[in-house]
Amino acid sequence: MDTEVYSNTGGQMSKSTPIGAITKFAYSGRGIGKKDLGAIAMSYGHVYVAQISLGANMPQTIKAFREADSYDGPSLIIAYSHCIAHGINMSKGLEQGKAVVDCGLWPLYRYDPRLKAQGKNPFQLDSRDPTTSIEDYMYKEVRFKSLKAASPDRADALLAKAKTQVERTWKEYKYLAERPF
C-alpha cells in the first residue's frame, strides 16, 4: 500500500511523496520526484512487479494479484492507497485512485518475468494515455491545494516539474511496453 507518506507515524514526507505535496518535513512542498520502486524491482529481472489502483481498474488489480500469487519467485504489488494525510474526504478514496491514474501520475502496469521465456515482452502497460490534467487530481487534495494557497509561484513551478515528470515517465513506460522482445 503506497500512501505516498509515512502514514503510520503522522504523515511525514517519504521517498514516495510526490512533487508539490506538503507533508511534515516538506512544508514548502516536496521539490523532487518520488522514487520509482517498481522500476527498481523490475531492474532485477526476476521479480514479478505490478502497480495497481483498485479505484481505477479492478480487473487489472485482480489479474495482478493472481499473477503474483502464481509466480514462483519474489512478487511486489504497489497499490495506490488514499490516506487521511492527503486531506480528502475518505469516502472519495476510490475516485482519487482513478483520478491519479487518469492524469498519468500513477501508471498501471505488470511486469511478469515468465513472459521472457516465451519470447514475449515482460512489461505490460495497462493504463491508457493520460486523459485529464494533473491539476484535476492534485487540487482535490489539501496536501497540494494548501501549497497553491500559501505560495502560488512555488506551486506553479512544482506543478510544471510534475508535468515534465509525467511526460518522461510515460515515454519510458511506453518504450518498455512497445519494444521488440
Residue ranges and their predicted role:
Residues A21, F25, G33, Y48-V49, ...:
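Generic preference for well-ordered secondary structure
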Residues M1-L76, H82-I84, I88-C103, S146, ...:
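Thiamine diphosphate
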Residues A26, S53-G55, T131, E135, ...:
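A short, terminal or domain-edge coil/loop segment
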Residues M58-R154, K161, K174-L176:
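Glycine/aspartate-rich loop-and-adjacent alpha/beta segment that forms the canonical ThDP
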